[in-house]
């Protein structure tokens, strides 16, 4: 929770100095122990200002989603060199799944940030879901009926 300290115009130099000594970054350890139990003088005009209210949801869905996005990103960092060193169908399908999921989550954040209005946002998310499903199906079709993602990239590099 962000807390700011505001010093009103009523305080003089002593009030400003006392505020600096109360800041954990500035005060030495021996002063810190001395000031722990002393109350803040109300006449000095020091106030707590709470910038953001604490909204805690009961589910861990957002945290798990954020963690899984980072896991897929790190997985891609290892999967790309592994696919170059060992091109096989397992790598092709793993790349198809990871790239599609990574793109879906990334474009989903773009839709969330830049598409406004409930109906328009629902339509954009439905379109994104359809696009992601078609992308995954197309990559799986390409892996099964053609050379696969790894060999296709290698053929492009030979050009």
UniProtKB/Swiss-Prot annotation:
Gene: SDHD
Keywords of this entry: Disease variant, Electron transport, Heme, Iron, Membrane, Metal-binding, Mitochondrion, Mitochondrion inner membrane, Primary mitochondrial disease, Transit peptide, Transmembrane, Transmembrane helix, Transport, Tricarboxylic acid cycle
InterPro entries: CybS, SQR/QFR_C/D
Pfam families: CybS
Function: Membrane-anchoring subunit of succinate dehydrogenase (SDH) that is involved in complex II of the mitochondrial electron transport chain and is responsible for transferring electrons from succinate to ubiquinone (coenzyme Q). SDH also oxidizes malate to the non-canonical enol form of oxaloacetate, enol-oxaloacetate. Enol-oxaloacetate, which is a potent inhibitor of the succinate dehydrogenase activity, is further isomerized into keto-oxaloacetate.
GO cellular component, one term: mitochondrion
Binding site for a ubiquinone: 114
Keyword Transport annotated: yes
UniProt GO molecular function: electron transfer activity; heme binding; metal ion binding; succinate dehydrogenase (quinone) activity; ubiquinone binding
Taxonomic lineage from the root: Eukaryota, Metazoa, Chordata, Craniata, Vertebrata
Pathway given in the UniProt record: Carbohydrate metabolism; tricarboxylic acid cycle
Protein family (similarity comment): Belongs to the CybS family.
Record's protein name: Succinate dehydrogenase [ubiquinone] cytochrome b small subunit, mitochondrial
């Amino acid at each position: 929770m962000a807390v700011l300290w505001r010093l009103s115009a009523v305080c003089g130099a002593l009030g400003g100095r006392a505020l600096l000594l109360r800041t954990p970054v500035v005060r030495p350890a021996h002063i810190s122990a001395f000031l722990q139990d002393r109350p803040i003088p109300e006449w000095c005009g020091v106030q707590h200002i709470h910038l953001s209210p604490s909204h805690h949801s009961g589910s861990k869905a957002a945290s798990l989603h954020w963690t899984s996005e980072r896991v897929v990103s790190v997985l891609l960092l290892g999967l790309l060199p592994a696919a170059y060193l060992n091109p096989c169908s397992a790598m092709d399908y793993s790349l198809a799944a990871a790239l599609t999921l990574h793109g879906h989550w990334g474009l989903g954040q773009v839709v969330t940030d830049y598409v406004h209005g409930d109906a328009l946002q629902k339509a954009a998310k439905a379109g994104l879901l359809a696009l992601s499903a078609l992308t995954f199906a197309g990559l799986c079709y390409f892996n099964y009926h053609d050379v696969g993602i790894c060999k296709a990239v290698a053929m492009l590099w030979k050009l």
